[in-house]
C-alpha cells in the first residue's frame, strides 16, 4: 500500500511539474546566487529546473549557487580573459568619478565582450542539440544582455520570463512599453531627494543615450544570431518584449515607487532567509564583542580592496578607532595584505575575506551595516531590519542608495568622502547609532515585507505555473510594448503640428505688425530719415 501511495504521489507530481531552464551567465557571484535562489524556489515546488551557468569568469565551480535545482556548467570560453579585464578595469577606477564618456565606454566594452562570449556559446552545437531535445516548458534569463532570449527562441521554448536583477535600467523600459520616469527615478544619473532641473535634464539625456547605445550593441548581437540561424531570425528586441512575465528581483517596499504593469511581479528576497545558518565559533565569538554592539562593513566584490586606493581601508580603520564601544566586522579582499597589517593595531576590528553575511545581518547584536548598496545586500538588510549607511560606487548602486534614503532607513554618503571627508562617514555612523528612528524604520520595512499577503516565493511559483499552464499571458501584456518613444508620446504627431503652427503663427504676427498702425509708424520713420 505504501509503495502504491509513493508511486501515485510521484505520478501526480510529474503530471503537474514543468521543465524549466534558467540561463545564468557567471558575470558575478551575486548574480549566480540570485539566479540560483530563483531556480531553487521553483525546484522546491516540484518542477524540473536546470540552471545553465556560462562560466565567463571561472567562478561557477567554487560558487554554491544552487542547492535543489540541477546545475550545468559550460566553460572554456576564449573571451573570458577579456571579460575579466573589463571587470578589473571597473575595480581599478571604482573610486574615480567617471565622466559621461567614461560610463559610455565602460558599458560599451562590457557589452561588446559579452556579445563575443555569446557568439562563442552559439557555436557549441552539441549543447544546443542537447537542450533542444530536453523540450523545456519555460525559460528565465536576466535583462543585462539579450543573448539568453535569442537562445531560448532558437531552442523553441514556448514560455519566456524576464528577470530584472535590479531596479529597471533605461533599456528595460523598451521591453515593457513603460514610460521612463526620468523626473523621479535615478536609473540613469543621480537624482537628489528633491531633483533639480539640472539633475532631471542629465537623467533624461543619459537615459536616452543609454538606450541608443544598447540598441547599437544589440544590433551587433543580432548579427551573431542571424549568422548562426539565418537572416530571418527575429529581432531580439521583439523576442524580449514578448515575454509573459517580468520578475523583478527587488521588493516594492524598498524601491522608489513608480508606474508598473499587470505582468510585472516583484520577487525580491527569494531564498534570503534560507541562507541564515548558524555561525561557526570564530564568527560567533566576533559577534559577541563590543560593549554596545557590532557594525558590519563591506564594499562588495566590484570595489576590490586590493585594487582600490589603499588609503580607503586605512581611513575606514581610522574611523573604527573612534568608536571603541563597537566591534567592527570588515570584509577585505584575501590579497589585501596592507589592510590586514594595519588592522592589527585596531583592537575593535575583525577583517576577513569571507563573512556569513545573512547570518551577520540577522544577529541581534548588529546595529548597523555600511554597504556599497548592491541589491542583494540591500534586500538582505531589509529583511533583517538593519539600518544602512550606503556608499554607492557604480551600476544600480546609486539608485538603490537613493531608495533607502527616501524610505528613511539609511543615510547616503559619497564614495569620495572615504578619502576627502572621513568626518562625514563618522557623522553618519553617530547619527544612526544614536538616533533610533533609523532602526525603527528599518524594522518597519522588515515587518512590511514579511507580512505581505503573498510571499515572493508564492508569487514566483504561482505566476510561473499560471503562465505555462495557460500557454502564455497575452491578455495582460502592455499594448505599447515594442513601441518607440517617438510613437508612444505621439511625437510624430506633436512635432509636425508644432512646426506647422509656428509656420502659420509667425507670418501672421509679422503681417499683422507690418500692416498695423505700428508698422506704418515704423515705415514713416524710415521715410523721414531718408528725406
UniProtKB/Swiss-Prot annotation:
It is found in: Membrane. Its EC number is 2.4.1.17. Keywords: Glycoprotein, Glycosyltransferase, Membrane, Signal, Transferase, Transmembrane, Transmembrane helix. One of its GO terms (molecular function) is glucuronosyltransferase activity. It catalyses: glucuronate acceptor + UDP-alpha-D-glucuronate = acceptor beta-D-glucuronoside + UDP + H(+). It is a single-pass membrane protein. The chain crosses the membrane at residues 493-513. It holds the Pfam family UDPGT. Residues 1-17 form the signal peptide. CDD domains: GT1_Gtf-like (cd03784). It comes from the Eukaryota. PROSITE patterns: UDPGT. One of its GO terms (cellular component) is membrane. It is an enzyme of class 2 (transferase). Glycans are attached at residue 304. Belongs to the UDP-glycosyltransferase family. This is Putative UDP-glucuronosyltransferase ugt-46.
Amino acid at each position: 500500500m505504501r509503495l502504491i501511495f509513493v508511486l501515485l504521489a510521484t505520478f501526480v507530481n510529474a503530471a503537474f511539474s514543468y521543465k524549466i531552464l534558467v540561463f545564468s551567465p557567471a558575470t558575478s557571484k551575486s548574480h549566480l546566487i540570485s539566479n540560483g535562489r530563483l531556480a531553487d524556489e521553483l525546484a522546491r515546488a516540484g518542477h524540473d529546473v536546470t540552471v545553465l551557468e556560462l562560466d565567463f569568469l571561472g567562478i561557477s565551480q567554487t560558487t554554491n549557487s544552487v542547492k535543489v535545482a540541477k546545475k550545468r556548467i559550460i566553460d572554456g570560453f576564449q573571451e573570458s580573459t577579456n571579460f575579466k579585464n573589463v571587470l578589473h578595469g571597473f575595480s581599478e577606477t571604482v573610486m574615480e568619478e567617471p565622466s559621461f564618456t567614461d560610463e559610455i565606454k565602460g558599458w560599451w566594452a562590457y557589452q561588446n565582450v559579452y556579445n563575443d562570449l555569446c557568439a562563442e556559446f552559439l557555436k557549441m552545437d552539441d549543447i544546443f542539440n542537447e537542450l533542444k531535445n530536453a523540450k523545456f516548458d519555460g525559460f528565465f534569463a536576466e535583462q543585462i544582455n539579450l543573448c539568453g532570449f535569442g537562445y531560448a527562441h532558437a531552442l523553441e521554448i514556448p514560455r519566456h520570463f524576464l528577470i530584472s536583477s535590479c531596479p529597471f535600467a533605461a533599456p528595460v523600459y523598451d521591453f515593457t512599453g513603460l514610460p521612463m520616469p526620468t523626473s523621479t527615478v535615478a536609473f540613469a544619473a543621480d537624482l537628489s531627494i528633491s531633483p533639480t532641473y539640472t539633475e532631471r535634464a542629465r537623467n533624461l539625456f543619459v537615459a536616452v543615450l543609454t538606450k541608443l547605445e544598447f540598441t547599437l550593441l544589440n544590433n551587433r548581437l543580432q548579427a551573431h544570431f542571424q549568422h548562426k540561424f539565418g537572416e530571418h531570425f527575429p529581432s531580439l528586441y521583439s523576442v524580449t518584449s514578448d515575454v509573459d512575465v517580468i520578475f523583478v528581483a527587488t521588493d516594492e517596499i524598498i524601491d522608489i515607487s513608480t508606474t508598473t504593469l499587470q505582468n510585472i511581479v516583484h520577487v525580491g528576497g527569494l531564498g534570503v532567509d534560507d541562507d541564515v545558518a548558524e555561525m561557526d565559533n570564530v564568527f560567533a565569538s566576533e559577534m559577541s564583542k563590543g560593549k554596545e554592539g557590532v557594525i558590519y562593513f563591506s564594499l562588495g566584490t566590484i570595489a576590490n580592496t586590493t585594487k582600490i586606493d589603499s588609503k580607503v581601508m586605512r581611513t575606514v580603520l581610522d574611523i573604527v578607532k573612534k568608536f571603541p564601544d563597537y566591534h567592527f566586522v570588515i570584509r577585505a579582499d584575501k590579497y589585501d595584505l596592507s589592510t590586514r597589517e594595519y588592522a592589527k593595531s585596531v583592537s575593535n576590528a575583525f577583517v576577513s575575506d569571507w563573512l556569513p553575511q545573512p547570518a551577520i545581518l540577522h544577529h541581534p547584536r548588529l546595529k548597523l551595516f555600511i554597504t556599497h548598496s548592491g541589491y542583494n545586500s540591500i534586500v538582505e538588510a531589509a529583511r533583517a531590519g538593519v539600518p544602512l549607511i550606503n556608499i554607492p560606487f557604480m551600476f544600480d548602486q546609486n539608485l538603490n542608495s537613493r531608495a533607502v534614503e527616501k524610505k528613511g532607513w539609511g543615510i547616503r554618503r559619497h564614495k569620495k568622502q572615504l578619502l576627502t571627508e572621513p568626518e562625514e562617514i563618522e557623522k553618519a555612523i553617530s547619527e544612526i547609532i544614536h538616533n533610533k528612528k533609523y532602526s525603527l524604520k528599518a524594522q518597519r520595512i522588515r515587518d512590511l515585507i514579511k507580512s505581505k499577503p503573498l510571499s515572493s516565493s508564492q508569487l514566483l511559483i504561482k505566476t510561473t505555473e499560471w503562465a505555462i499552464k495557460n500557454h502564455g499571458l497575452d491578455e495582460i501584456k502592455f499594448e505599447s510594448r515594442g513601441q518607440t518613444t517617438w510613437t508612444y508620446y505621439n511625437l510624430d504627431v506633436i512635432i509636425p503640428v508644432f512646426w506647422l503652427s509656428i509656420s502659420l503663427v509667425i507670418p501672421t504676427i509679422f503681417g499683422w505688425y507690418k500692416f498695423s498702425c505700428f508698422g506704418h509708424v515704423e515705415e514713416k520713420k524710415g521715410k523721414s530719415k531718408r528725406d
